[in-house]
Amino acid sequence: MSETLGILKALADDTRLKILRALSERDMYVELLAERLQLSAATVSFHMKKLQAAGLVDSRREQ
């Protein structure tokens, strides 16, 4: 039940929905998402952490 609640809370935010929509088209790094959504990289990072905590996205560092 708490896992479902976490997912629903993550999906309740418009910005996070926009991020998920953009990522459904292709993988993107934070800076590109920020540019595309006209947000700061810090804002995108904040929301990505929430999406990761809910298990909705994975992240990786490019080398």
Task: Name what the model sees in each region.
Residues 2-43, 54-56, 61-63:
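N-terminal helix-turn-helix DNA-binding core of bacterial DNA-binding proteins
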Residues 47:
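Residues within the DNA-recognition helix of helix-turn-helix
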Residues 50:
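Alpha-helical DNA-recognition elements
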